[in-house]
Amino acid sequence: MSKTPRKSAPSPSLQLGQAVEWPDRPEAAKLDRVPNPQKDTNFLARFTAPEFTSLCPVTGQPDFAHLVIDYVPGPWLLESKSLKLYLASFRNHGAFHEDCTVAIGKRIATEIKPKWLRIGGYWYPRGGIPIDVFWQTGKLPKDVWVPDQGVQPYRGRG
């Protein structure tokens, strides 16, 4: 285990432990990162957001997705409260499924500089067609176990 001393209060630059406003758009959201105490070890971290929402850019109707974000950290870890706020900022954002999914993956990769990152966006049907969107930064590092994302293909009543 790392010998990082426990701090009595979070850094004032982090949103963690602070009362913050919900960002009204993705561009206004801040993604926080914290130092990775295991930066010399390849391991997988996973975030799952089963109730992600955004808006259809044409109709303004809500779209829903189950997002799975896997990454092999480099020097930084993604702080989960800031991720929650960032994802919530899409609630009133109009964009197509593909754009939302890829933009989220690229933004996270830019902020934390992982060794590897992938995102799976499993969008619930609108107009009878589910859309699944996948993006990753490149080749997975060796010796990293990556479990299946665990989201079954959409089947409806069939």
From Swiss-Prot:
Residues given in the record as substrate binding sites: L78, E79, S80, H97, E98
Alphabetized InterPro entries for the sequence: GTP-CH-I_C/QueF, NADPH_dep_7-cyano-7-deazaG_red, QueF, QueF_type1
Cellular component aspect of the GO annotation: cytoplasm
Cellular localisation: Cytoplasm
Domain of life the protein comes from: Bacteria
Record-level Gene Ontology MF annotations: preQ1 synthase activity
HAMAP family on file: QueF_type1
Chain coiled-coil ranges: none
Organism in which the protein naturally occurs: Rhodopseudomonas palustris (strain ATCC BAA-98 / CGA009)
Catalysed reactions, as listed in the record: 7-aminomethyl-7-carbaguanine + 2 NADP(+) = 7-cyano-7-deazaguanine + 2 NADPH + 3 H(+)
Family: Belongs to the GTP cyclohydrolase I family. QueF type 1 subfamily.
Alphabetical keyword list: Cytoplasm, NADP, Oxidoreductase, Queuosine biosynthesis
Pathway note: tRNA modification; tRNA-queuosine biosynthesis
Positions of the UniProt region annotated as Disordered: 1-20
Name of the molecule in the record: NADPH-dependent 7-cyano-7-deazaguanine reductase
GO biological process: queuosine biosynthetic process; tRNA modification
Active site: C56, D63
UniProt-listed Enzyme Commission number(s): 1.7.1.13
Function: Catalyzes the NADPH-dependent reduction of 7-cyano-7-deazaguanine (preQ0) to 7-aminomethyl-7-deazaguanine (preQ1).
